[in-house]
Amino acid sequence: MFDFGLGELIFVGIIALIVLGPERLPEAARTAGRLIGRLQRFVGSVKQELDTQIELEELRKVKQAFEAAAAQVRDSLKETDTDMQNSLHDISDGLKPWEKLPEQRTPADFGVDENGNPLPDTANTVSDGISDVMPSERSDTSAETLGDDRQTGSTAEPAETDKDRAWREYLTASAAAPVVQAVEVSYIDTAVETPVPHTTSLRKQAINRKRDFRPKHRAKPKLRVRKS
């Protein structure tokens, strides 16, 4: 802290020895050491405070720069948001609104329900349309069609090909085949029951064997009598 050399320190010590004397010199040296220690601690605390203030100032500058950058980014995002909203408004204004919504088709329009099954009304209408035709009309129409077919066949009979001939032979052979009557087969067991000879069961045989192995004469235990 103080730029003192060795010669200067020796000179100061000699002057203090002459002025204070050998009795008070040790106490004065201790007091001077305490003062110098306090002064050094004070200087160290001042340096630490200065360093802290410098660091805080640097941090404050960094914080301000960061806040400025964040504000710029926020402003740019706001500008882009406004631009996008303006462009969307322009696009929506340019579109023509629908005068009316298009007609929505339902499954009932196609004759089925939500699960894809045909509706009962449509099935009934189809069956009614088929049943409306009278049997006499059916027979008349069938007769007319047969008559037309015969007339057309009599007027123009095409030449029979090999394929048609093979089909005709196959059909006539299948029609002329004899009908085989089905033979009924009963699955009821008709075997004659034969009488089974009477035999003892295995359990009874085992019981009889155990009885045979038992000793016939059991030894009686002998009782001891204490002699008094």
Curated annotation (Swiss-Prot):
Residues 206-228 have a biased composition (Basic residues). The keyword Cell inner membrane applies. GO terms for cellular component: TAT protein transport complex. Gene3D superfamilies: 1.20.5.3310. Keywords: Cell inner membrane, Cell membrane, Membrane, Protein transport, Translocation, Transmembrane, Transmembrane helix, Transport. GO terms for molecular function: protein transmembrane transporter activity. HAMAP family: TatB. Part of the twin-arginine translocation (Tat) system that transports large folded proteins containing a characteristic twin-arginine motif in their signal peptide across membranes. Together with TatC, TatB is part of a receptor directly interacting with Tat signal peptides. TatB may form an oligomeric binding site that transiently accommodates folded Tat precursor proteins before their translocation. The Tat system comprises two distinct complexes: a TatABC complex, containing multiple copies of TatA, TatB and TatC subunits, and a separate TatA complex, containing only TatA subunits. Substrates initially bind to the TatABC complex, which probably triggers association of the separate TatA complex to form the active translocon. This is Sec-independent protein translocase protein TatB. It comes from Neisseria gonorrhoeae (strain ATCC 700825 / FA 1090). The gene is tatB.
